[in-house]
Amino acid sequence: MVEYKPIKKVVSGNYAAAYAVLHARVQVVAAYPITPQTSIIEKIAEFIANGEADIQYIPVESEHSAMAACIGASATGARVFTATSAQGLALMHEMLHWAAGARLPIVMVDVNRAMAPPWSVWDDQTDSLSQRDTGWMQFYAENNQEVYDGVLMAFKVAETVNVPAMVVESAFILSHTYEIVNMIPQELVDEFLPPRKPLYSLADFENPIAVGALATPADYYEFRYKLARAHEEAKKVIKDVGREFGERFGRDYSEMIEKAYIDDADFVFMGMGSLMGTVKEAVELLRKQGYKVGYAKVRWFRPFPREELLEIAESVKGIAVLDRNFSFGQEGILFTEAKGALYNNGARPIMKNYIVGLGGRDFTVSDVKAIAEDMKKVIESGKLDREVEWYHLKR
């Protein structure tokens, strides 16, 4: 690890994101305010007003326009950032496809917020996961430190494989809650994240090109294949960047799934984001009570870490998949992805889906303990009473 003195700041998740944008030397920000994302953009605007950041800020009239502006700026070779939540992310949908298809390494923070109606400003992963097929990579932060680190790593990964990346944090649980974050001195960030070397630039007037023009059936197929390959290639890049980050700064992200106690666990809890902090605390207590249980925190949902999941599945009898989201007419989204990843690979642990915390409903250590007791019964009996459990349902 590089010897350095971290800059300790007590900041919210949103401010952690803004500081990462500052330290990444982002050149262009285009955004439209929406609760609970707003303070990210306000803090960036403060940096600009105080002369701390040399960022071109583009005020726009909607989230669709924000992403359109980001696309234009990124296509000229700039390092570009935006942020949004929920309905704003949904309004961006068309442009998300465009950014990925044009191979533009834009980084966006999505502050997870439940989709309306009914209106809700609280935590729910459905907004980001409903964009899983747009071609964006997705990193889920457990805490404010991971928000800061995640933005820095997302830029390096995205600019290496030329695919946009989304860093996802929980509404209010992280976005407006203050924690100590160890920030990195600017000169060390510069060494880790050098200036962007664009795949192409519309500002290169000596070598004019067209981007996004019509592709006939003779060519379109290969464009999709190349984007698909970029996602697969991103897995190695993610691990390499995560390992380098750990070697430089002491926080290792070389695994796409952070895991513990897999070797002796009968079953593991699998989930993403801030709820996994609760799970970790509960697992420590449960193990002291004699439960053979572990956890698997999915850091990167896209590209999906199927190889790492298979290693876990081969070691345990069961997986309790915790989804703070739901795909209507189906089941929890992480549950679907996990089952699909294992289907042709031999490992078939018993899997049960628990729908938890929708719309920001509290998910506590006591809830994890209750789910552990249910999973213990499932493992002992060898069969499911039901595949999907709406755990928090009022009865």
Swiss-Prot record:
Transmembrane segments: none annotated. InterPro entries: PFOR_II, Pyruvate:ferred/Flavod_OxRd, Pyrv_Fd/Flavodoxin_OxRdtase_N, THDP-binding, Transketo_C/PFOR_II. The lineage of its organism: Archaea, Methanobacteriati, Methanobacteriota, Thermococci, Thermococcales. The keyword DNA-binding does not apply. NCBIfam families: PRK08366.1. It is an enzyme of class 1 (oxidoreductase). It comes from the Archaea. This is Ketoisovalerate oxidoreductase subunit VorA. SUPFAM superfamilies: Thiamin diphosphate-binding fold (THDP-binding), TK C-terminal domain-like.
